Swiss-Prot record:
InterPro entries: UL17-like. The gene is CVC1. Interacts (via C-terminus) with capsid vertex component 2/CVC2. It is found in: Virion; Host nucleus. Capsid vertex-specific component that plays a role during viral DNA encapsidation, assuring correct genome cleavage and presumably stabilizing capsids that contain full-length viral genomes. Keywords: Capsid protein, Host nucleus, Late protein, Viral genome packaging, Viral release from host cell, Virion. The keyword Repressor does not apply. Transmembrane segments: none annotated. Its main location: virion. Belongs to the herpesviridae CVC1 protein family. This is Capsid vertex component 1. GO terms for biological process: chromosome organization. It comes from the Viruses.
């Protein structure tokens, strides 16, 4: 596809491998990502070796497709996109990870791919048998290829007899010289020689090297791959005219004893530990505030509720369940991550909110921007403006949903049904801000 060619043409480098993907609509639905032609895409490599920082995000092209020859109907429609994978000395680590960041308006989504699945078509035997190249691959020496595609400028002799015959007879200058100071070997300066300008020998014609370029017409070899995280199918395209150099796994260079100490999920574990640590600390601040006020909470949003023990017990249950759910909600799309990244960029004060679904009812809505809350808004006015937000009011008027509002200063408010609010805080260090800025921007 032309979008694959564009990504390969403008993003390929000696230290990068471009992997071309076809992502069906069902693949986006499994990640709860809207299937929209206005999606924009970015690629980043995160390394298994935790001492190596992730690469910068690279913007890539994506294009919607509705049908492609050879693809099953379940693979259509979809979006064609490419991933930029950083390698070193033609070696890749199967446990490294490349992240596809997807933006739609102000919403950010992430899809993670392990390199073991992205390099699968290049090492699987089945992918080598089914190919669309018409002519078999030939081992061609690069020097021979150059000599066969350029015109000769000197007379070459293919046998010793030709060399001896050349020594016994005089011949005009065998090659054109662009500078008269250059002379043939063995000539004596001052001895009369035929001038290059006086010779009647015609100058050799310039022969341009022509390369056949049929990148857009080449048919790719399409391989179906299972996504490790969701078990959903997607497709990798291998083009004969855009083939990647043969890469070797770093696991082939280490011993079996060393391999036993390698954690395949180290890069995931490190990120989950980071996100869990800050969610856990935030929940602790909420519990500390409740204890300091003898579990008396204030209603900041005017919502009519029943004043009885059953309502009070329900609010307490929502608080307890929210604390458990928050500690397990380790997502780079969370409101506090968006707020931390805004602080990393030194942007003006802004607000984001997470709508948390409790008791496994529904899907969380994370990192949603609240544009009506401006930089100079005070808390009293903040609650008034939120009371005009339909989605916010729908959350606090019904059971099974709570909200976490976070600003760029990392102040956070837990909003329970009925408009009751508990204020906490995310304690973020400068190192944490750099960690978020490098990965979740």
């Amino acid at each position: 596809m032309d979008v694959h060619f564009d990504n390969w043409r403008f993003l390929s480098r000696p230290d990068k491998v471009i992997v071309h993907l076809l992502l069906p609509q069902t693949f986006f639905e499994s990640h709860h990502i809207p299937f929209d032609p206005n999606l924009t895409f970015w690629s980043q490599t995160r390394f298994h070796h935790l001492d190596f920082p992730p690469t910068r995000y690279v913007k890539i092209w994506g294009k919607l497709y509705f049908s492609l020859p050879g693809l099953p109907s379940k693979a259509c429609p979809g979006i064609a996109v490419s991933l930029v994978i950083n390698i070193e000395e033609n070696m890749y680590n199967p446990f490294d990870m490349t992240v596809l960041k997807i933006l739609l308006n102000e919403n950010i989504y992430y899809i993670k791919f392990f390199h073991m699945e992205l390099f699968f078509p290049y090492i699987a035997p089945n992918s080598l048998q089914d190919t669309s190249i018409e002519e078999p691959f030939k081992n061609v020496d690069h020097i021979d290829a150059i000599l066969n595609t350029t015109s000769p400028v000197t007379n070459l002799y293919k046998n010793p007899l030709g060399v001896l015959a050349n020594l016994l007879q005089s011949r005009p200058q065998s090659s054109p010289r662009h500078h008269f100071a250059l002379e043939d070997p063995g000539k004596v300066r001052g001895y009369e020689q035929p001038s290059l300008l006086q010779t009647d020998k015609a100058m050799p014609k310039v022969s341009y090297v022509k390369h056949k370029w049929s990148i857009l017409n080449s048919e790719p070899t399409v391989t179906c791959v299972k996504h490790i995280f969701t078990k959903k199918s997607y497709f990798i395209c291998s083009y004969p005219t855009m083939s990647n150099s043969q890469c070797t796994s770093v696991l082939d260079t280490i011993s079996v004893q060393e391999l036993a100490h390698v954690s395949p999920t180290a890069v995931l574990d490190a990120e989950k530990a980071f996100l869990f640590k800050h969610q856990h600390r935030f929940v602790n601040t909420l519990e500390h505030v409740c204890k300091s006020k003898n579990y008396a909470i204030e209603q900041h949003v005017p919502v009519l509720i029943q004043k009885d023990e059953e309502t009070a017990s329900s609010i307490k249950d929502h608080f307890t369940e929210t604390c458990f759910v928050l500690e397990s909600t380790v997502s780079e799309a969370s409101a506090w991550v968006r707020a931390t990244f805004a602080r990393y960029l030194n942007k003006p004060k802004a607000f984001w909110i997470d709508y948390i679904r409790l008791w496994e009812e529904g899907v969380h809505t994370l990192g949603k921007s609240v544009p009506e809350l401006k930089e100079d808004v005070c808390e009293e006015k903040m609650w008034h403006l939120l009371s005009l937000n339909k989605e916010f009011i729908h959350c606090i008027r019904n059971q099974g949903c709570t909200g976490v509002l976070v600003d760029s200063n990392l102040n956070a408010w837990l909003i329970l049904p009925g408009g009751f609010v508990i204020k906490g805080h995310y304690n973020i260090t400068p190192e944490d801000i750099l960690f978020v800025g490098a990965r979740y921007g």
